[in-house]
Amino acid sequence: MKQYLELLNDVLVHGIKKPDRTGTGTRSVFGWQMRFDLSQGFPLVTTKKLHLRSIIHELLWFLRGETNIAYLKKHQVHIWDEWADATGELGPVYGKQWRRWAGADGHEIDQIRWLVEEIKRNPDSRRLVISAWNVADLPQMALVPCHALFQFYVANGKLSCQLYQRSADIFLGVPFNIASYALLTHMLAQVTGLVVGDFVHTLGDAHLYANHVEQASVQLGRVPRPQPVLRLNQAVTDLFDFTYDDIVIEGYDPYPAIKAPVAV
């Protein structure tokens, strides 16, 4: 995961100090790209321990099209708690846009189901794009999409993914985002009869919060360990049939977790 540590170091050393929506303050750079060859191990940060249950269940929650945190809380995942209302609702966030985008004529568009079928039907398409950035729905969202748009690319039997992330909390959020979209790429490759290629992560405003600087320095002092391996249940042939137990990450040997506050 040297790509991630290079980003962390660059923002720490060269980032421009800027105010932000949360009032915390950041150091940021604009425009950064990382590339991970998914055939060479699962891109999970090893220089601090990540909460795998949260990463996996959040992705499954997105794929279920849900916008209420009840599913997450049931599985002891609390990464969205700060933004939910008293009923657990977040408004039309990722799950709604991925699975039930409201068309102009009122009918709902299942972007993810369409994507699976289109990869099978027309793998050379340049339109294998999913967007969570629904301008009309932004005012109703508890938190507007940070990872806003992603595209898939098929070549030589390999499925690659590129994510555009407009806002990137590089200490807390980005390690989760890398793992989540790498996992999604593996799952999609399996159900479409492909193997994994690259995950390309393009960042807009890549920022380190002022109260994460000390933690970032600690992390940069650690030497990365070997990447783990992802094992999916090969019996699963439908993307929407994956469960938590179908996803196993082997050989993850991280350093201890580094606590840091979430900017809300």
From Swiss-Prot:
Predominant location: cytoplasm
Q: Which GO terms describe its molecular function?
A: thymidylate synthase activity
CDD domains named in the record: TS_Pyrimidine_HMase
Q: Where does dUMP bind?
A: R21, R126, R127, R166, S167, A168, D169, N177, H207, L208, Y209
Entry-linked InterPro entries: Thymidate_synth/dCMP_Mease (IPR045097), Thymidate_synth/dCMP_Mease_dom (IPR023451), Thymidate_synth/dCMP_Mease_sf (IPR036926), Thymidylate_synthase (IPR000398), Thymidylate_synthase_AS (IPR020940)
- Say if the entry is tagged with keyword Amino-acid biosynthesis: no
The EC number(s) given in the record are: 2.1.1.45
**What job does this protein perform?**
Catalyzes the reductive methylation of 2'-deoxyuridine-5'-monophosphate (dUMP) to 2'-deoxythymidine-5'-monophosphate (dTMP) while utilizing 5,10-methylenetetrahydrofolate (mTHF) as the methyl donor and reductant in the reaction, yielding dihydrofolate (DHF) as a by-product. This enzymatic reaction provides an intracellular de novo source of dTMP, an essential precursor for DNA biosynthesis.
What protein is this chain from?
Answer: Thymidylate synthase
